[in-house]
Amino acid sequence: FEITNFSNNLCYSGKVLSTKSQGAFGELWSSIKTVNVNGKRERENQINLVEAEAIVDTVVKCCQNPLYRNMSMGVISLLGDEQGEVIKDLLEKKLGQDKIRERNILCGTPYTFQGEERDVIFLSMVISNNIKFATLTKDSDVRRFNIACSRAKKQMWLFHSVELEDMSKDCIRYKLLDYCKNFKIINKKGNIKIA
């Protein structure tokens, strides 16, 4: 429920639309994880290499962890195609094609994942403070983030290089990071203010 609650509130006025299984792995398991990597977005493209490397290292560790046995995985860039391509290339070098096929690992943008789900999804926010970034408030932004945040069946990781105070509260990125960092508190209160 924790994973889908953000999307449900964002797009469906809080009505629960999915009953994806969560918390099936005991106390060590959290259905939502955030990782601040303090990376920097490159000036000439939409790549945050530190974030990409952190995601790849985490995917590799998850593939080696018995808790993730037989789980499919996906990586979604929340800013353009380039980050997903870099992550895909790094995964091919670190894991190899056989392990990528075995885990059904897919890398791309939210639209790459339309109609697709994976047990574990890793989101890359990409943006950082070294380059100005837009406040995302359009319906198309909301749809993109809704797709990204509703692809995980068991666990979602959000990798970021900015903090809440770096963004406008109106930005969908702010709302996602706030939810992921505070989902246990928000769910106990029973609601999250999206708009």
PLM ranges: what are they?
Residues 29-32, 117-120, 152-156:
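Short glycine-/polar-rich loops that comprise or flank the Walker A/P-loop
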Residues 91, 97-123, 128-131:
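Conserved motor-coupling elements within RecA-like helicase/translocase cores
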Residues 14-89:
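Conserved helicase/translocase motor-coupling segment
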